[in-house]
Amino acid sequence: MFKIMLIEDDHTLFSEIKERLSQWSYDVFGVSNFEKVIEEFTSLKPDLVIIDIQLPKFDGFHWCRMIRQHSNVPIIFLSSRDHPTDMVMSMQLGADDFIQKPFHFDVLVAKIQAILRRVHNYTSEQTQLKTWCGATIDYESNTVSNHVGSIELSKNEFFILKRLIERKNKIVTRDDLIRSLWEDERFISDNTLTVNVNRLRKRLDELGLGAYIETKVGQGYMAKEDGNTHD
């Protein structure tokens, strides 16, 4: 069952949306503290987020920015505001759709279904295909598992590992990694990249895989299959 986080301060509308979506077997969760939306988001790990623009303390644009620093979860904006700049701003911040109030619930359900179908099918496709050095790489849970055990990586660590595995046995430059991270809205510096790669190796060492990530001095990194010791 998919979990939906509904960031809406209108209690009547929240109850209506929750009731309607529950009929379609969606679990809908609200926000108990509008100053701690990110904390609640991180704890819940929803499959999709619906955000109103006008909210207490900080507006929906603020929370969209914050969520995008942590996740690529699908986001739908709801708003009674009808100015084109609101829709443009939503899309620029990384929202997947914008629905103007008042709206028909069938439209909301259809958009949710379309987004989740697209995202779920895409991630499932990737999850089934990724193996490396006898380990299973799970794109949905950011985990790496083999006969030794299983570890969960941070978003950045997993992104770096994924990028290296996609080009295994080839050098991936530091600039390429940083650029890819920025394109995915994970803004890190050159020094931070080094820290993340070192952390990644340390975590992979728990599964006996740390040596499979090699440093190519002055060039970048390589995901190997032979396990030669890295620098």
Curated annotation (Swiss-Prot):
Q: Which domain of life is it from?
A: Bacteria
Which residue windows are coiled coil? none
**In what way is this protein post-translationally modified?**
Phosphorylated by BceS.
Question: What GO cellular component term, any one, is given?
Answer: protein-DNA complex
Where can this protein be found? Cytoplasm
GO BP term, pick one: regulation of DNA-templated transcription
**Keywords recorded for this protein, A-Z:** Cytoplasm, DNA-binding, Phosphoprotein, Transcription, Transcription regulation, Two-component regulatory system
Per the database record, which ranges form the Response regulatory domain?
Answer: 3-116
In Gene Ontology terms, what is one molecular function of this protein? Answer: transcription cis-regulatory region binding
The protein's matches in InterPro entries, at most eight in alphabetical order, are given as: CheY-like_superfamily, OmpR/PhoB-type_DNA-bd, Sig_transdc_resp-reg_C-effctor, Sig_transdc_resp-reg_receiver, WalR-like, WH-like_DNA-bd_sf
- Note whether Cytoplasm occurs among the keywords: yes
What positions are modified (4-aspartylphosphate)?
Answer: D52
> Which part of the chain engages DNA, per the record?
127-225
Pfam short name (any one): Trans_reg_C
Q: What does this protein do?
A: Member of the two-component regulatory system BceS/BceR involved in the regulation of bacitracin resistance. When activated by BceS, binds to the upstream region of the bceAB promoter and up-regulates the expression of these two genes.
Identify this protein by name. Answer: Sensory transduction protein BceR
